[in-house]
């Protein structure tokens, strides 16, 4: 049953494809990727974008995988612009030439988020699994030359976190208007590589100090956002600002999710935009209503004074670690399952770091 208190979604993450030129070990896409032949057609995506705008979506985030792998990306961007949506492109930058950047700006892209693996070219390419560092720098310059605002997204992990300050410096040099430093979120392939990616407490402390210095050094410059490592905190992150409250995700095959990692919760039914209207999925589906509000909560969340701020933490993380999506997020110090997180932290030492398993390509 639909909750009459639920408002319209503000944003939609549009995962056009799982195909990607990179092989990052912290990839948050599902372990089982959507094959090219199972991807939605341009016509199907056009209909979904139209439905989303009618539903109330005002921000459309084109992502993947790598959205530039879709030759119909410019047409879909143009359709989103004609619908009146704010268009954001989330990209690795591989293949984003000056010509393509100008064309996408002309078609309707309002903003670009570009991933950067490291300030050190060799280290960054080792994580990306491809020789792409120079291409990324050229893509960043193409974005700013096209007159588009640029956000540089940097995922922090054990292998690059000691260069936090250098990565901020590089992003500033590239003309970034916004820099997001996000500690690795352990979903999908990232959870598989957790032991190799988890930084030490000392590394995190040094990174926070580097961010503090950068904010002082670049005061009045680009916005600098730091996303904390929730495993080391005693309170969970307010994931998605609440389940099914402001955002939805559509996968390459048309599955509609309350958050990008909700594929991990195998106990929930999977809704698909080819089988049910987007408005019905948002307002009336069991998957979207399962963890809205606070009625689903158990103790200690049910009576916690922070329940309206942190929403009980991340449902996907709770399921992946406990097998119960309604459990208190184990990252919370009050969770009866906090020992699961503490055990993972206990494995992080100053000794040898296990090798990570690179993300494989979409099967042919």
From Swiss-Prot:
Q: Which purpose does this protein serve, as stated in its record?
A: Catalyzes the cross-linking of a glutamate residue and a tyrosine residue in the PqqA protein as part of the biosynthesis of pyrroloquinoline quinone (PQQ).
The root-end lineage is:
Bacteria, Bacillati, Actinomycetota, Actinomycetes, Kitasatosporales
EC number annotated for this UniProt entry:
1.21.98.4
Could you tell me which InterPro entries the record lists for this protein? 4Fe4S-binding_SPASM_dom, Aldolase_TIM, Elp3/MiaA/NifB-like_rSAM, PQQ_synth_PqqE_bac, PqqE-like, Radical_SAM_PqqE_MftC-like, rSAM
Its domain of life? Bacteria
Transmembrane stretches, start-end: none
Cofactor(s) listed: [4Fe-4S] cluster
Q: Which reaction does it catalyse?
A: [PQQ precursor protein] + S-adenosyl-L-methionine = E-Y cross-linked-[PQQ precursor protein] + 5'-deoxyadenosine + L-methionine + H(+)
Task: Write one Gene Ontology MF term.
Answer: cyclase activity
Q: What pathway or pathways are given for this protein in its record?
A: Cofactor biosynthesis; pyrroloquinoline quinone biosynthesis
Q: Which CDD domains match?
A: Radical_SAM (cd01335), SPASM_PqqE (cd21119)
Which GO biological process annotations does it have?
pyrroloquinoline quinone biosynthetic process
The UniProt entry's sequence similarity note says: Belongs to the radical SAM superfamily. PqqE family.
**Tell me, how does this one assemble?**
Interacts with PqqD. The interaction is necessary for activity of PqqE.
What protein name applies here?
PqqA peptide cyclase
Per UniProt, the cofactor note for this protein states:
Binds 1 [4Fe-4S] cluster. The cluster is coordinated with 3 cysteines and an exchangeable S-adenosyl-L-methionine.
């Amino acid at each position: 049953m639909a909750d009459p208190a639920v408002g319209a979604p503000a944003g939609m993450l549009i995962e056009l494809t799982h195909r990607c030129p990179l092989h990052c070990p912290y990839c948050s896409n599902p372990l089982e990727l959507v094959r090219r032949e199972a991807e939605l057609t341009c016509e199907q995506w056009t209909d979904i974008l139209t439905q989303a705008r009618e539903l109330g979506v005002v921000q459309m985030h084109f992502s993947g995988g790598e959205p530039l792998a879709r030759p119909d990306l410019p047409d879909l961007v143009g359709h989103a612009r004609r619908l009146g949506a704010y268009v954001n492109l989330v990209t690795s930058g591989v293949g984003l030439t000056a010509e393509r950047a100008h064309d996408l700006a002309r078609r309707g892209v309002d903003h670009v988020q570009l991933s950067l693996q490291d300030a050190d070219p060799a280290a960054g390419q080792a994580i990306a699994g491809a020789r792409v560092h120079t291409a990324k720098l050229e893509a960043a310059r193409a974005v700013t030359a096209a007159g588009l605002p640029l956000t540089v997204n940097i995922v922090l992990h054990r292998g690059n976190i000691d260069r936090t300050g250098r990565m901020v410096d590089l992003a500033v040099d590239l003309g970034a208007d916004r820099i997001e430093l996000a500690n690795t979120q352990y979903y999908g392939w990232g959870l598989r590589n957790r032991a190799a990616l988890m930084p030490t407490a000392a590394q995190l402390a040094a990174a926070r100090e580097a961010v503090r210095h950068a904010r002082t050094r670049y005061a009045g410059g680009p916005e600098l956002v730091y996303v904390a490592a929730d495993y080391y905190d005693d309170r969970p992150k307010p994931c998605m600002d609440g389940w099914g409250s402001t955002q939805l995700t559509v996968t390459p095959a048309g599955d509609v999710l309350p958050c990008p990692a909700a594929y991990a919760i195998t106990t929930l039914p999977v809704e698909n935009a080819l089988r049910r209207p987007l408005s019905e999925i948002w307002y009336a589906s069991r998957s979207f209503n399962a963890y809205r509000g606070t009625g689903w909560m158990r103790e200690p969340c049910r009576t916690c004074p922070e329940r309206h701020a942190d929403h009980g933490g991340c449902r996907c993380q709770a399921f992946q670690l406990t097998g119960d999506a309604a459990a208190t997020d184990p990252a919370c110090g009050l969770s009866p399952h906090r020992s699961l997180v503490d055990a993972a932290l206990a494995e992080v030492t100053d000794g040898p770091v296990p090798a990570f398993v690179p993300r494989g390509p979409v099967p042919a």
